Regions:
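Secondary-structure end/capping motifs
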Residues: 230-313
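Bacterial N-terminal signal peptides that target proteins for export
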Residues: 2-14
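Short, glycine-/small- and polar/acidic-enriched structural segments
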Residues: 30-177, 181-188, 209, 215
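Conserved C-terminal helix/tail region of periplasmic/extracytoplasmic solute-binding proteins
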Residues: 303-338
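Short helix-capping segments at alpha-helix termini
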Residues: 56-59, 155-159, 197-200, 268-270, ...
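Pocket-lining segment of extracytoplasmic ligand-binding domains
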Residues: 92-93, 170-174, 178-268
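N-terminal signal peptide c-region/cleavage motif recognized by signal peptidases
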Residues: 22-25
């Protein structure tokens, strides 16, 4: 059957219109990014939630999925399994994973100070690190144990004989119930759980890894090294980082707003504004570059210090070889400055 020219033109116009709409939609479609957090929703990750809540990701043309972590989630495994584009991790566990064969590369360092500490009851008889010998010390595992193990090696304490290591759950019960002389805490979280449980600050002794000279870099952003060969990936991560750092600046300036963003994102309903605001106020102390152009920039000297700590762990160091400059890049951070 022969179609009339008019019908053919109309049909062609319709087809072109549909194609045009499809092309236009494709052109403006947001780029997808999935970030895997190290732990459950809390102010430790307020910058990501703030960036989402304030529309910074959307404004950057991104569709960002924020995956919470948890006790049964290993962020590096999620990243290696290609279920995320980028992850939040501590440098000790990231470098240990890299040495074990997962090619992690640091692309940004949000926290430039450590919030990790051991919190002890004075009545346990601990007043200095010299008193650790013979005591039970609570330690988080799942990658969080590396700074502790390095510290004990530096003190010359064997973890299988000189002290008793309690594999600590993610609560403060061992200290409250006197099952351990000291437990692992973060200045922005578990330490305050101890206080909220009724223990007075004057009855506690705290040892900050930062002050003990054994601190390592904590919350940073990591990707898989092969992906960095893709210019489009680097550009996409640059957009993500720029929006994320904007979210962190906003969170530091507005702890209450950050707390609201975190609570809104916590589907478990366990978060409270009071607790998350306090946590954000303490997290802010770990981001000394907030509000400056240096936020998120990994200082090579800080990287070198962390690697030195990880290598000088006595007979059982966290890593056995210096990963070198290949373990970090400023390419994504530089892309975020555009």
């Amino acid at each position: 059957m022969i179609r009339s020219p008019k019908f053919t033109s109309s049909l062609m116009a319709a087809v072109l219109a549909v194609c045009g709409v499809a092309a236009s939609t494709s052109a403006i479609a947001n780029e997808a990014v999935t970030v895997q957090l190290k732990w459950v929703p809390q102010a430790q990750f307020a910058g990501y939630y703030m960036a989402a809540a304030k529309g910074f990701y959307k404004d950057a043309g991104l569709d960002v999925t924020i995956k919470p972590g948890g006790p049964d989630i290993a962020p590096t495994q999620v990243l290696a399994g290609k279920q995320a584009d980028i992850e939040v991790d501590w440098m000790p566990s990231a470098m240990a994973s890299r040495e074990a064969g997962v090619p992690l590369v640091n692309v940004a360092q949000v926290f430039d100070k450590s919030g990790l500490m051991l919190t002890c009851k004075k009545k346990s008889g601990v007043s200095s690190p010299k008193d650790f010998k013979g005591k039970t010390l609570g330690v988080w595992y799942g990658g969080n144990e590396y700074p502790f193990l390095n510290w004990m090696n530096k003190l010359g304490l064997k973890t299988d004989s000189d002290i008793k290591v309690l594999k600590q759950g993610f609560n403060v019960d061992p200290l409250l119930q006197d099952q351990a002389a000291c437990i692992s805490t973060m200045i922005y979280n578990e330490y305050w759980q101890v206080i909220d449980a009724g223990v007075k600050e004057k009855d506690l002794v705290t040892f900050f890894y930062e002050k003990e000279g054994v601190s390592t870099l904590e919350d940073g952003l990591y990707v898989l090294e092969p992906n960095l060969k893709d210019a489009a990936f680097v550009a996409r991560m640059g957009k993500f980082l720029k929006a994320t750092l904007k979210g962190w600046d906003a969170a530091v300036k507005d702890p209450e707003g950050a707390a609201k963003a975190v609570v809104a994102a916590d589907t478990s309903g366990s978060s409270s504004l009071k607790v998350q605001k306090r946590q954000m106020e303490n997290v802010a102390k770990l981001i000394s570059n907030a509000g400056t152009k240096k936020i998120g920039y990994l200082e090579p000297a800080a990287f070198d210090r962390t690697i030195k700590v990880l290598l000088t762990g006595g007979s059982d160091p966290v890593i056995k070889k210096d990963p070198g400059k290949a373990a970090y890049t400023h390419a994504v951070w530089e892309a975020a400055q555009k």
